[in-house]
Amino acid sequence: MMTRAIFLDRDGTINVEVGYLNHPDQVELIPRAGDAIRLLNEAGFKTVVVTNQAGIARGLLQEELLPAIHQRLSALLDQEKARIDAYYYCPHHPEAAIEQYRIACQCRKPFPGLIRTAAADMGIDVARSWVIGDKSCDIELAHNVGAGAVMVMTGYGKTELALHEEAQRQPPHHIAADLYAAAQWILRESR
């Protein structure tokens, strides 16, 4: 049987937004993020990070450091008895400073590549899954793949929601104060 997943944006949703996070020491959980992910783990959802990492394309982050950043995030979550099942990222940007990353790809959110790859790898039923993030591209991604969309007001959430509404884009299914509130709402909706 296909499994359900929560596709999570990383920066500003799980960990504190610091601009271009480029070192494991900069990783700091947003309050209650670990509790939120633990609730989702306990409810049987796969938890999958899907993140644009344009800092790689812009030369602000070495791609080789990304595994260490994700290990640090996983270690912090482990202390709260929470886990991320997989990490998927896009290192590209159409205006990248580094030529090898300067492509118009299908993996950069809101394009569906990261979720399609994760779904194929992990046997995920996307129609029974959710995307949670703090940016308009996360909400557009959810709509593009047919998943539920929850926008959080941490990170860039408040600014991005205003821009999203101003552009008259399809709204999220729910707006939550933070990842914990988003998880609680999804668990109520998914009974």
For each feature predicted by the language model, list its residue ranges:
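Acidic, Mg2+-coordinating phosphoryl-transfer loop and its flanking beta/alpha structural elements
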Residues: 127-174
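Active-site neighborhood of HAD-like aspartate-dependent phosphohydrolases
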Residues: 1-48
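Metal-dependent phosphoesterase signature
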Residues: 14-30, 56-65, 79-82, 96-107
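Conserved hydrophobic residues forming the short capping helix/wall of the S-adenosyl-L-methionine
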Residues: 73-78, 119
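Short acidic-hydrophobic, aromatic-tinged amphipathic segments that line or gate anion-handling sites
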Residues: 173-178, 182
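Substrate-recognition element of Asp-dependent hydrolases with the DxDx(T/V) motif
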Residues: 33, 37-73, 82-96, 142
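Conserved Lys-Pro-Asp/Glu-containing loop-to-beta segment of HAD-superfamily phosphomonoesterases
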Residues: 106-139
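Short, electropositive alpha-helical surface patch
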Residues: 60-74, 100-114, 140-146
